[in-house]
Amino acid sequence: GHGISNTFHELPNILHYGKKNTGLEIYPGMTFTIEPMINAGKYNVKILNDGWTAVTKDKSLSAQFEHTVGITENGYEIFTESVKGYTKPPY
C-alpha cells in the first residue's frame, strides 16, 4: 500500500509483509491504503516496465484487494468499506 494525501501515491510505502511491532508507527490523521496480495505460488513479485503492474515472479495466479484506511483518535476507519456491509455492487 501507500500513503494518501495531496497526491494519490505518497510515502509511506506499506509493504505486503512484515513482523508484528517492527513496522511504521501509525498515529491519528494518517491515511493510507492496505493492498494485500494472495498468491497461488510464492510471495515474490516484480514490477513490470510500466512502473505499476505487480506480477508474481513464478508466474502463478494472484489476486489483490485494496482498502483505504484513516487512523482516528479511537482506532481506524475503513473509507472503502460499504456502509451497508455489502460485499458487491450496489454498495
Description of each model-found segment:
Residues 1-14:
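Short, basic/aromatic beta-hairpin or loop at an interaction surface
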Residues 18-91:
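Charged, cofactor-coupling segments
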